[in-house]
Amino acid sequence: MAIISEIIQGTKIINEIQSTNIKKTEYDTETKKLVVEFSNGFKYEYDNVPHQLYTQFRMSESQGKFFSTNISKTFKYKKI
């Protein structure tokens, strides 16, 4: 998996990801909210994700595996 593109808009970092399950992420450095858009079109917002953890997620060899292990069941989330 790899980051296809990255856009920074104010406090938001938007990444399009080449992954089987994850299509796109949006991270707000101010609110620490992470929005993940999956390949099936569903979007979820995760609260209070530390910036350092988001950076590790972006740089990981397998974002899908990192997400499943360190984010998906660790942080409060809602479907949006």
Label every PLM stretch briefly.
Residues M1-I80:
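Acidic/histidine-enriched, beta-strand-rich ligand/metal-binding domains
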